[in-house]
C-alpha cells in the first residue's frame, strides 16, 4: 500500500508527463493560466499547504511558483551542450515566480495562474510531503513500526521491534568534523 501511495504522489507531482485519469501538475501548468483547473483533494491540499505553510515558514525559499526559472535549469542540463542558462533568460523568468499569482479557490478546489508565464515545480518539497503523507496513511492502516528512507527523506514510525528507538545517520557534507 505504501508503494501505491508514493506512486500516486509521484503522478500528481509530475511536471513532465500526463497520466490518463489524473489531473497533475503537468496539466495544471499547461492549463491554469487560461482557466481555473479543478484538482483532486490530495493535490489541492498539497498546494494549499505549500502556499500557506511551507512558503512562509521558509521565508519564500520553498517557492513552488519558481517553475519558470527551474525549467531553464532543467533544459540547460538536458541540452546536448549543457551550460548554465543565459543570465537575461533567468532575469526574465524571475518576473514570473510570485506566489501570489497562484490562486487557489477553496470552494471550487481549483488552481489558477494570474501570470500566464507562471509554472509550478514542487521539487523542493514534494518528496518530503509525499513521504510524510504516506507514513501517516500507513499508520492509519495500522502500521506501528517502520523506517522509511525514500531517496534520502527518512521517516520513522514507532520504534524498532523490541522497543528501541530508530536511529538515522546523517553524513557531514563538509568533511570529517563532527560539528
Language model: regions and residue ranges:
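Mature catalytic core of soluble alpha/beta enzymes
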Residues: 1-179
Amino acid at each position: 500500500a505504501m508503494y501505491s501511495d508514493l506512486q500516486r504522489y509521484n503522478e500528481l507531482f509530475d511536471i513532465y508527463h500526463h497520466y490518463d485519469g489524473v489531473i497533475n501538475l503537468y496539466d495544471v501548468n499547461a492549463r491554469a493560466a487560461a482557466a481555473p483547473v479543478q484538482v483532486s483533494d490530495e493535490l489541492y491540499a498539497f498546494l494549499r499547504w505549500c502556499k500557506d505553510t511551507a512558503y512562509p515558514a521558509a521565508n519564500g525559499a520553498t517557492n513552488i511558483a519558481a517553475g519558470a526559472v527551474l525549467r531553464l535549469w532543467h533544459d540547460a542540463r538536458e541540452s546536448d551542450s549543457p551550460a548554465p542558462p543565459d543570465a537575461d533568460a533567468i532575469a526574465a523568468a524571475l518576473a514570473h515566480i510570485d506566489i501570489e499569482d497562484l490562486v487557489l479557490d477553496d470552494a471550487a478546489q481549483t488552481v489558477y495562474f494570474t501570470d500566464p508565464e507562471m509554472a509550478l515545480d514542487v521539487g523542493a518539497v514534494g518528496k518530503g510531503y509525499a513521504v510524510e503523507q504516506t507514513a501517516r496513511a500507513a499508520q492509519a492502516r495500522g502500521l506501528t513500526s517502520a523506517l522509511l528512507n525514500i531517496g534520502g527523506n527518512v521517516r520513522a514510525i514507532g520504534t524498532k521491534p523490541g522497543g528501541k528507538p530508530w536511529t538515522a545517520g546523517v553524513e557531514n557534507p563538509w568533511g570529517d568534523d563532527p560539528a
